[in-house]
Amino acid sequence: MKIDLAHFTLRQMMEMEACTRCGECIETCPTYAEVRNEEIHPLQKIAQTKSFWKADHLGLLARLFGIRPATEGERSTYGRGVYQCTLCARCHVVCPVQIDTRPLWISMREQLVGWGLYPEIFDTLRDRVTNQHNIAGED
């Protein structure tokens, strides 16, 4: 299960490389402030995404640098962090290199859907819309 780079624009990949890991985004993230879980904060999401793409696409070079493919558990943890984000974009506002985070988080979610890692409620909502033509499940 490789990361599909088609979900990310060239600009997004360059922005992730440009992240200075300054931590400004951590202090402003309302979700992280509430739950204090590292998988949620922007630095971690960017670091994990970069790690996945390097392990999946650098081949021998990745092995030389000790980058190993992600386990299913690591991908699942990553997914929880990506989906707990509210997409408020406060991290973008304070980012010194102006990483456009909201579209980046959406691209990460697209990748997770490709892996089949998304909140179960999405299946319920899809089924309700398909069968009852609304998310409330009412006829």
Residue ranges and their predicted role:
Residues 33-49:
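Membrane-interface helix-loop junction between the first two transmembrane segments
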Residues 1-38:
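Long, charged N-terminal interaction/targeting segments
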Residues 6-16, 46, 50-139:
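Iron-sulfur-cluster electron-transfer modules
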